[in-house]
């Protein structure tokens, strides 16, 4: 055999061996893509927080008038498992929350299901759900005016999973050719009384809500409705559309009928105002060539307090605290605390807000490192919160976050009268 023939034979054998190895190495395993009968995931979280208290703030005075402090430390351990059991077309889904918090003043624990519901899907276009479900209505990142049947987000941590409500819900989806590509209808029934969904609203009612989703000319549109019952009747819509591959615009609008607001004068005289209210949101999301993500939103809260109403409440708290110091009588402070729980002390109780979040992916080529900055401003009184944070996920199934929250504002402003002036937080999560 000549050298040429030997080389040709060797090349042929090598090619056959390589082909056989490739066929063996890249064999498609369909079982790897089959749905498992049971799935389990979640995370364990350790969180340490340090609070610098705002001793001149109205909310601080309500909570610490008889126990003055300058700082608080809080350690929290959280276990959040989630899973799914499948049996044919049915499944049982859950997301639990087990939490223990050790604070300077004592310990608090909580154990609950954020979600626990059965689901039946006999057809890809039909789903029936029953149980405790956490819905996500609305396109806004920090706020959702049309989130009629869900709990309010924390704008400082809007991606945190929320607790759901117990309900019966369905989902019907149909796809088409043409400008209208998808239609989805989601009706639901949400009972509320002293025993079930007791914090959804007032009275004992069977509430009916629905959402209609349309994908029309590459624009996502939702029409939402909630019947009159535990909460007053409300309806609205949202939309989202990509203006470019790296630029998205979104918005929401909601109309709430016969809303009630309790407002107080500086002397403590409380009145209830009634009337319809409109809330809306408009936002942009932009991704730059440097992998920097910008989220900008404007939110108008039609149910919120005016600047004057907030200042009257602050003056009432100051007067109540002065009476307590002079007489030891805390009756006015107790009344002010009830008003705070009803609206004044809730997150973002004002009328007009701006939200900006800037996130930079892996700056200076530091892998798995993501710094971010969040700013929330009350545009009526000029007070703001500024939240810088650092996120690192370079270890397998592990995430570390360090962030600080700084509140700025003068006397009588929303963030200037809060319980804290700053907060430092370290969080570690182990996912499984």
What are these regions (language model features)?
Residues 248-367, 373-375, 415-417:
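Extracellular/periplasmic loop regions
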Residues 88-94, 125-128, 177-183, 216-223, ...:
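Repeated loop/turn-to-beta-strand initiation elements of outer-membrane beta-barrel proteins
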Residues 170, 354-358, 418-432:
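Outer-membrane beta-barrel "beta-signal"
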Residues 76-190, 214, 409:
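Outer membrane beta-barrel
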Residues 46-52, 85-89, 98-102, 134-136, ...:
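Transmembrane beta-strands of outer-membrane beta-barrel pores
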Residues 22-128, 390, 399-403, 421-427, ...:
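Beta-barrel outer-membrane channel/assembly domains of diderm bacteria
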Residues 42-44, 94-96, 130, 170, ...:
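Membrane-embedded beta-strand positions of outer-membrane beta-barrel proteins
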Residues 71, 103-109, 160-162, 196-206, ...:
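Solvent-exposed loop/turn segments connecting transmembrane beta-strands
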């Amino acid at each position: 055999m000549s050298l040429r023939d030997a080389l040709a034979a060797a090349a042929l054998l090598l090619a056959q061996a390589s082909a056989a190895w490739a066929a063996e190495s890249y064999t498609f395993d369909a079982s790897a893509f089959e749905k498992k009968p049971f799935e389990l995931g979640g995370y364990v979280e350790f969180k340490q927080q340090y609070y610098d208290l705002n001793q001149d703030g109205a909310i601080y005075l309500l909570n610490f008038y008889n126990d003055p402090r300058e700082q608080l430390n809080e350690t929290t351990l959280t276990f959040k498992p989630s899973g799914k059991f499948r049996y044919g077309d049915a499944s049982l889904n859950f997301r639990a929350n087990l939490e223990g918090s050790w604070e300077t003043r004592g310990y608090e624990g909580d154990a609950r299901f954020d979600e626990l519901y059965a689901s039946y899907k006999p057809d890809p276009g039909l789903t029936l759900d029953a149980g405790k479900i956490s819905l996500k209505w609305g396109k806004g990142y920090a706020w959702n005016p049309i989130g009629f049947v869900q709990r309010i987000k924390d704008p400082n941590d809007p991606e945190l999973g929320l607790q759901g409500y117990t309900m019966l819900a369905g989902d019907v989806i149909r796809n088409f050719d043409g400008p209208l590509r998808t239609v989805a209808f989601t009706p639901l029934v949400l009972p509320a009384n002293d025993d079930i969904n007791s914090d959804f609203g007032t009275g004992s009612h069977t509430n009916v809500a629905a959402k209609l989703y349309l994908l029309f000319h590459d624009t996502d549109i939702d029409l939402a409705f909630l019947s009159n019952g535990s909460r007053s009747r409300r309806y609205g819509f949202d939309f989202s559309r990509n203006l470019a591959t790296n630029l998205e615009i979104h918005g929401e609008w909601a109309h709430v009928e016969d809303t009630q607001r309790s407002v107080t004068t500086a002397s403590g005289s409380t009145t209830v105002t009634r009337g319809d209210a409109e809330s809306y949101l408009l936002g942009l999301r932009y991704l730059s060539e440097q992998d920097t993500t910008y989220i900008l939103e404007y939110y108008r809260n039609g149910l919120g307090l005016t600047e004057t109403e907030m200042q009257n409440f602050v003056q009432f708290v100051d007067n109540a605290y002065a009476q307590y110091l002079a007489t030891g009588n805390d009756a006015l402070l107790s009344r002010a605390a009830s008003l705070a729980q009803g609206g004044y002390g809730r997150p973002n109780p004002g009328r007009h807000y701006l939200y900006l979040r800037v996130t930079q992916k892996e700056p200076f080529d530091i892998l798995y490192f993501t710094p971010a900055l969040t700013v929330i401003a009350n545009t009526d009184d000029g007070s703001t919160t500024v939240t810088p944070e650092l996120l690192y996920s370079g270890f397998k199934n592990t995430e570390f976050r360090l962030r600080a929250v700084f509140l700025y504002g003068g006397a009588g402003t929303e963030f200037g009268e809060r319980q804290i002036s700053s907060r430092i937080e370290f969080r570690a999560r182990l996912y499984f």
